[in-house]
UniProtKB/Swiss-Prot annotation:
Protein name (database record): Core protein p19
Organism annotation: UR2 avian sarcoma virus
Free-text note regarding domains: Late-budding domains (L domains) are short sequence motifs essential for viral particle budding. They recruit proteins of the host ESCRT machinery (Endosomal Sorting Complex Required for Transport) or ESCRT-associated proteins. Gag contains one L domain: a PPXY motif which potentially interacts with the WW domain 3 of NEDD4 E3 ubiquitin ligase (Potential).
Keywords on record: Virion
GO cellular component entries: virion component
Region Disordered, annotated ranges: 107-150
Length: 150
């Protein structure tokens, strides 16, 4: 359990800064979660599937017992875990796009889906063939679009 506490503490220090919970607070929270049967192993904490049940159980505990310490700690830990997970995804995508994936192929994200030609031209700042008047003529008066100025 000590290794998990160190990893979580490090992530919290990185992503929570001065509000980071102490190792003692993290350890107490993990012990409570194991005692309550929400974690079979401390490493289960890394699984996003366990996050909602943990949040619900700690919220219920706060309402029944009025104890908010573990919920506050969990909120900080959860924020750090989500940030670390997002950063890892971003890092993996960057490696894939740069061809540094080491043979591991990841599916492209939604931003890699081919855009229609008109959207590509808009992204590049070119004019689109359809004018505002033509677009407005297709819409009902209450749906008239106001062109955005960039």
């Amino acid at each position: 359990m000590e290794a998990v506490i160190k990893v979580i503490s490090s992530a919290c220090k990185t992503y929570c800064g001065k509000t980071s919970p102490s190792k003692k607070e993290i350890g107490a929270m993990l012990s409570l979660l194991q005692k309550e049967g929400l974690l079979m192993s401390p490493s289960d904490l890394y699984s996003p599937g366990s996050w909602d049940p943990i949040t619900a159980a700690l919220s219920q505990r706060l309402m029944v017992l009025g104890k908010s310490g573990e919920l506050k700690t969990w909120g900080l830990v959860l924020g750090a875990l989500k940030a670390a997970r997002e950063e890892q995804v971003t890092s993996e995508q960057a490696k894939f796009w740069l061809g540094l994936g080491g043979g591991r192929v990841s599916p492209p994200g939604p931003e890699c889906i081919e855009k229609p030609a008109t959207e590509r031209r808009i992204d590049k700042g070119e004019e689109v063939g359809e004018t505002t008047v033509q677009r407005d003529a297709k819409m009902a008066p209450e749906e008239t679009a106001t062109p955005k100025t960039v």
